[in-house]
Amino acid sequence: MNNDLFPGEEQLSTAKILAVDDEDGDIRALEWVCRMAKFANFRSVNDSARALDVFREFQPDLVLLDLHMPEPDGFAVLKQLRETVPAGDFLPVLVLTGHDTIEMRKRAMKAGANDFLGKPVDYTEVTLRMRNLLQTRFLHRQTQEMQARLKALTAAQEADKPTKSGQKL
């Protein structure tokens, strides 16, 4: 398998990560995790009402989202994010919450979360999940770019085909 097709450490280290959590201690812990994992572009917002504005301005590659926050709660923020992301784009959302039940996991996944971890999180596990979600995002973007190039090449080939009396041969 050609490793050039997969996102490298440099691409992963420059990924933009946005954390949305109303608990300052959790924000500091996530910032520490990102620093230790060599993710250089970390931004946080502790006011869920500002989350969408920060999201639009920062344009992250990954969102770390707490579910239990003052209005709007994490489910409302997740819904807003999903409505904002253009069709065909893949924005991974990793839900982190202290209310870790099977029902909460199902509800979060149905609402559009890509992954779910209960708090407190394990440093290694959250790092691995973040890396996996970022790799998926970058591979999705790369696939879209390749499809666009293939479509353009196919259109150019079709335009260059010889014709006879206006009909393609």
Go through each PLM region and give its residues.
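Receiver (REC) domain active-site loop signature in two-component systems and cognate sites
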Residues: 69
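Acidic, metal-coordinating helix/loop segments flanking the phosphotransfer/catalytic sites
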Residues: 44-62
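Non-catalytic signal-transmission and effector/linker regions of two-component phosphorelay proteins
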Residues: 1-18, 141-169
